[in-house]
Curated annotation (Swiss-Prot):
InterPro entries attached to this UniProt entry: ELO_CS, ELO_fam, ELOVL2
Native source species: Homo sapiens
Tissues of expression: Liver and testis.
GO BP term, example: fatty acid elongation, polyunsaturated fatty acid
Name of the protein this chain belongs to: Very long chain fatty acid elongase 2
Length: 296
C-alpha cells in the first residue's frame, strides 16, 4: 500500500506541476482527488477487451437482450437528465455562448460542475459498450476508433473536472448528451428484431456526431478569437482532440457509406440488420464471403 500511495503522490504531483493548481470547488468529489481510480479503470477496460476476446473465442456468443435493454434505457435517461440540467444551469448563470469564464456565474458554475461530474462518470459506465461487444462476439465493432474514443474521453474528463469544471467546458457535453439520447435509443430499439425495419436512420447518427464535433471545435475556437480568461492551453487541446475524432469518424463514414462496393456481393447493409454503435455485422460478413470465393 505504501508503494501505491507513493505512486499516487508522484502522479498527482506531476499533473499539478503540468496544469497548475486544481479547482478547489471540486476537492473531495468522488474519484477526482486521485488519478489512480481513473487510470486503473482504464487499464481494466483495455485488459477486459484483450482477455475477454480470448475467453470468448471458443464459446458461443451471449444474447444479453434483457441487460442491453435496461442498459440502453439507463444511458438514455441519464443523458436526458444531463441535457436538461446543463441547459437550465447555464441559462440560470447567464452563460455567454461565445466564451464563458470559470468563476463569474457563482452558484450556477457549481451546478454545471456537478452535471459535468456525472458526464465524466458516465464515460466509465460506457465502457460496458465494449464489454457487451466482447460477450456477444461482435469483434468487428471493436475498432481503434471505438476503443480510442471510449478510453480517451474518460481520462480527459478527469482532467477537465479537476482544472476547468465549468464555464466554456459546458458546450461539448450539452451536445453530446443530446446525441446520446438519439444513439442509445437507437441501440435499445435495435435489440428487438421487430423494430429493425424502422431503423433506417443509422447513417444520420454518424452525420450528427460529425456535426457535433465541428460545432464543438467552432465553439472552442471562438474563445480563442474573443478570450474571456478561460485557459488558452485547454482550448487548443480540446480543439486538437476534437479534430482527431472528426478525422476518425469521417473515415468511418466514408468507408461505410460512400465507398463503392468492390463486388456485387458486398452490398450496403440493409436497415433491417442489427446495428450497434455505427457498425454492421452484415457488411463484414459479405466481405468475408467475397474473400472466401477468391480462395476457392
Amino acid at each position: 500500500m505504501e508503494h501505491l500511495k507513493a505512486f499516487d503522490d508522484e502522479i498527482n504531483a506531476f499533473l499539478d506541476n503540468m496544469f497548475g493548481p486544481r479547482d478547489s470547488r471540486v476537492r473531495g468529489w468522488f474519484m477526482l482527488d486521485s488519478y489512480l481510480p481513473t487510470f486503473f479503470l482504464t487499464v481494466m477496460y483495455l485488459l477486459s477487451i484483450w482477455l475477454g476476446n480470448k475467453y470468448m473465442k471458443n464459446r458461443p456468443a451471449l444474447s444479453l437482450r434483457g441487460i442491453l435493454t435496461l442498459y440502453n434505457l439507463g444511458i438514455t435517461l441519464l443523458s436526458a437528465y444531463m441535457l436538461a440540467e446543463l441547459i437550465l444551469s447555464t441559462w440560470e448563470g447567464g452563460y455567454n455562448l461565445q466564451c464563458q469564464d470559470l468563476t463569474s456565474a457563482g452558484e450556477a458554475d457549481i451546478r454545471v460542475a456537478k452535471v459535468l461530474w456525472w458526464y465524466y462518470f458516465s464515460k466509465s459506465v460506457e465502457f460496458l459498450d465494449t464489454i457487451f461487444f466482447v460477450l456477444r462476439k461482435k469483434t468487428s465493432q471493436i475498432t481503434f476508433l471505438h476503443v480510442y474514443h471510449h478510453a480517451s474521453m474518460f481520462n480527459i474528463w478527469w482532467c477537465v473536472l479537476n482544472w476547468i469544471p465549468c464555464g466554456q467546458s459546458f458546450f461539448g457535453p450539452t451536445l453530446n448528451s443530446f446525441i446520446h439520447i438519439l444513439m442509445y435509443s437507437y441501440y435499445g430499439l435495435s435489440v428487438f428484431p421487430s423494430m429493425h425495419k424502422y431503423l433506417w436512420w443509422k447513417k444520420y447518427l454518424t452525420q450528427a456526431q460529425l456535426v457535433q464535433f465541428v460545432l464543438t471545435i467552432t465553439h472552442t475556437m471562438s474563445a480563442v478569437v474573443k478570450p474571456c480568461g478561460f485557459p488558452f492551453g485547454c482550448l487548443i487541446f480540446q480543439s486538437s482532440y476534437m479534430l482527431t475524432l472528426v478525422i476518425l469518424f469521417l473515415n468511418f463514414y466514408v468507408q461505410t457509406y460512400r465507398k463503392k462496393p468492390m463486388k456485387k456481393d458486398m452490398q450496403e447493409p440493409p436497415a433491417g440488420k442489427e446495428v450497434k454503435n455505427g457498425f454492421s455485422k452484415a457488411y463484414f460478413t459479405a466481405a468475408n464471403g467475397v474473400m472466401n470465393k477468391k480462395a476457392q
